[in-house]
């Protein structure tokens, strides 16, 4: 099929997928207002003729064909840096396709246990790459009582598990939580949420299926209202993406789409690999947002005439330090990359984990600085409608 255009991507989503939002069953997400922003965001990544980002979005495969760079397997530091650059200019609807890097980076380890699984991984990767499809990172199970293992829960279907093994495939049941962009991509790439023990073979499962596979149901939720005014919310209005509660109601998965079915020694391998690539994307996003915070803090301070205020300057200095620590950590992780036996390079695991921890541990303080600098205007500043109203606007 080759590269899709934005309109091709949008039409590809009208495929009979079963999805809900606010209690409403939505037969065609391309026509529903709740999905307008997330679909439009992801469609931007299909603009290969964009004068600024078109070249960054494309690369040549080993076959000489064009593909989206999200599928490029980095083999040099420069290619790894190109990936970082791409992800800083990419919607989360495309960024979650880093799940394919997680699979490909452990393909050889999987092959040592069961070569057929490794062949399935490569086949899926090439299928999605060559058809310009997007995949979601489907990893987090509803964990119930966290003192208990997966097979010890009162409800055996809290974790996704195999309920039937057949000659032509497996049948799975259960659910996954917090699945970003699940309704606006093409493939649900399911991974183990953690390592599994020998008595949990049914829960050691990994596979990929199309979103419209019978038995798959997605319940969407978003922290943002349905429509955010870009004037009042210049950043948030352009970054709305639903989180999916993905249900597998006795879903059949053919063997050629299975990457793990009971081989518990591979569960940790797959979970850790996805964790690394997911955290890398998280750190890239953290660098971008932290730099935005610095600029916002400076604007608010200048608006209030407090450029020389000692407290304001100290707060901005803390925000700058936070942003630079994250940026330098990401740079270090790429310069001190690690490499698989087959030559695929990936960010330094320790550096990425440390950066992700630092980001999360200090994020609330950065928001506190912004609140302190902005004051009550954060909540009570009149909106665009009041500004445009000739009667009230003249006072604003």
Question: Where do the language-model regions lie?
Answer:
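Alpha-helix capping/hinge segments and adjacent helical runs
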Residues: 350-396
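Internal helix-loop-helix
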Residues: 47-135, 181, 187
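Loop-to-helix element that buttresses phosphate recognition and phosphoryl-transfer chemistry
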Residues: 314-339, 358-361, 365, 371
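A short core secondary-structure module
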Residues: 175, 179-228
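Glycine-rich beta->alpha junctions and the first turn(s) of the following alpha-helix
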Residues: 229-324
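Gly/Pro-rich turn-and-neighbor structural signature
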Residues: 106-175
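Short, surface-exposed, low-complexity cationic segments
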Residues: 30-49, 183-193
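N-terminal-proximal low-complexity accessory segments that begin disordered
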Residues: 1-43
């Amino acid at each position: 099929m080759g590269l899709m255009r934005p309109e091709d991507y949008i039409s590809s989503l009208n495929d009979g997928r079963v999805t809900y939002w606010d209690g409403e069953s939505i037969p065609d997400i391309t026509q529903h207002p709740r999905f307008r922003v997330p679909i439009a965001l992801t469609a931007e990544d299909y603009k290969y003729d964009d004068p600024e980002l078109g070249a960054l979005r494309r690369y040549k495969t080993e076959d000489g064909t064009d593909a989206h760079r999200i599928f490029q397997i980095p083999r040099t530091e420069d290619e790894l840096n190109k990936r970082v650059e791409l992800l800083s200019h990419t919607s989360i609807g495309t960024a979650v396709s880093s799940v394919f890097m997680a699979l490909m980076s452990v393909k050889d380890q999987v092959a040592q246990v069961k070569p057929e699984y490794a062949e399935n991984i490569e086949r899926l990767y090439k299928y999605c790459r060559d058809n310009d499809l997007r995949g979601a990172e489907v990893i987090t199970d509803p964990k119930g009582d966290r003192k208990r293992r997966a097979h010890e829960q009162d409800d055996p279907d809290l974790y996704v598990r195999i309920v039937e093994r057949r000659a032509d495939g497996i049948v799975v049941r259960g659910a996954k939580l917090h699945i970003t962009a699940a309704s606006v991509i093409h493939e649900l790439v399911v991974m183990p949420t953690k390592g599994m023990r020998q008595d949990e073979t049914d829960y050691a499962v990994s596979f990929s299926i199309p979103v419209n596979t019978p038995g798959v149901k997605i319940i969407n939720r978003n922290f943002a209202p349905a429509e955010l005014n870009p004037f009042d919310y210049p950043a948030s209005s352009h970054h709305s993406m639903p989180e999916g509660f993905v249900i597998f109601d006795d879903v059949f998965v053919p063997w050629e789409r299975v990457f793990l079915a009971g081989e518990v020694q591979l569960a940790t391998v797959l979970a850790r690999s996805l964790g690394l690539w997911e955290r890398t994307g998280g750190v890239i996003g953290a660098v971008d947002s932290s730099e935005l915070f610095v600029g916002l803090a400076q604007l608010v301070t200048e608006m209030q005439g407090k450029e020389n205020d000692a407290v304001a300057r100290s707060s901005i200095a803390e925000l700058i330090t936070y942003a630079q620590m994250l940026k330098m950590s990401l740079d270090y992780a790429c310069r001190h990359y690690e490499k698989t036996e087959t030559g695929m390079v990936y960010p330094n695991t320790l550096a990425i984990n440390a950066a992700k921890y630092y980001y999360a541990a200090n994020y609330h303080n950065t928001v506190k600085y912004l609140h302190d600098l902005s004051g009550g205007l954060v909540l009570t500043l009149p909106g665009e409608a009041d500004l445009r109203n000739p009667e009230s606007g003249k006072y604003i």
